[in-house]
């Protein structure tokens, strides 16, 4: 055991609020930059109350859910055409019920994967596309060549397909599962996008028009499954071929899972207000946003440890990020970073009180999470956390040096550092620690494997697209857009389009990583995909994480706070 590990295992827990009085903090009156973040719109008294006053699921609803679950299992076991089975799987997944039917879904998809005897999907655009998407999502490889039958001799998609809106929509969604170099899928995406955009306002079926509009705003593969489930439950209710058993179970299940999440939110809110970090004026106070992100990554009730530790580490991480970005001087940040590298509180007395509070909160919470993992999972994760925190803070330190030195790095250098500074290697490692098979498996995340590299790079670039206007106004660190502008002389508009193109290309690489990263299994592969989907949710239209009163508020409220009305039973 090295010295840092020994320190972590034996260090006493320090209550930072006993040692730091923010009201009399001597560095509070100094001329320091501020994040200018607005106060949280979420009432912390209300959030804390959710620990005991969350939505209680009645016993009769629990019994009804079990009854309906049995009926759905019967559906999976009943004889049906392959396309009908695919559509059943698709609806179950989109309704958010896949965690209840993991075995049935895998068996259904694997049987369809093996059954190529008569090519039942051949020439059927919707069937071919749905089969392609669902099997690739499940980790079963289907070649892009299955779409050649819809192309002419010059490689263009047949114009007759333009009248098949349902098929075009399925083709559009399937195209986002493509890999780098799969030109047929690139053509499919361009073709389907073009003709869906021109057709959706004239679609007679309201449910189909709603689905098309929703997909064009953001493809299914890029959406957060839990948020999508809330939207799809309402959309599915309006469809002519809606299955009432599936709909009723989806509503019950959504509320049951939400009740579990609410209790966790309440307990986490109680912890957060004891840290003192919620009182720091320069930093973001975003506990509920952090929970929403953990829920995006791992909403299944069985991932409680992953969710809670991601929120705890993530909430502290956000404050550390803001300290490096806008608060600390370069000398202070160098001392902070060296203390993290030593994983020691010995030198932090030289820091101003606010940075002492932040360091001790980080130190305490990380050791506390490590002890919880030791208790619940049976292995020592603290060395893994220390490596991740050192990597994290050194990336922040480098960005601070660029800022204080007025240096604009090349885009490639910025991106390699930025994929760490975005925080997702640390957060995904936190999630991995909560589900790893054993202690030896923790070695897989250092050095950073491709799966984490590309998911984190995507989150960095998506974040940059959404936050650059606000952060430029605050005088924050550079973003990829500015690095590209500086290196090429391009306008901001051109730079934005370039970064959007890079995002699309890196999604293709990540899609392939999900097949190539054999050292990782589910659910960690999905954790990585979902982290990027969370980035799309928070940053697709601006800074929905830092600005709490934004478009994200409605979705967060519907997913975390408001249950679905059940109506008459």
Swiss-Prot record:
Say if the entry is tagged with keyword Nucleotidyltransferase.
no
Entry binding sites for Mg(2+) 2: 321, 325
Entries under Gene3D superfamilies matching the protein: Farnesyl Diphosphate Synthase, Terpene synthase, N-terminal domain
Query: What cofactor does this chain's UniProt record say it requires?
Result: Mg(2+); Mn(2+)
Q: Name one Pfam family in it.
A: Terpene_synth_C
Q: What does this protein do?
A: Catalyzes a mixture of sesquiterpenoids from (2E,6E)-farnesyl diphosphate in fragrance biosynthesis. Catalyzes the formation of alpha-santalene, beta-santalene, epi-beta-santalene and exo-alpha-bergamotene, as well as traces of alpha-farnesene and beta-farnesene.
What PANTHER family does the database record attribute to this sequence?
Answer: (-)-ALPHA-TERPINEOL SYNTHASE-LIKE (PTHR31225:SF245), OS04G0344100 PROTEIN-RELATED (PTHR31225)
Name of the featured protein = Santalene synthase
Q: Please name the source species.
A: Santalum austrocaledonicum (Sandalwood)
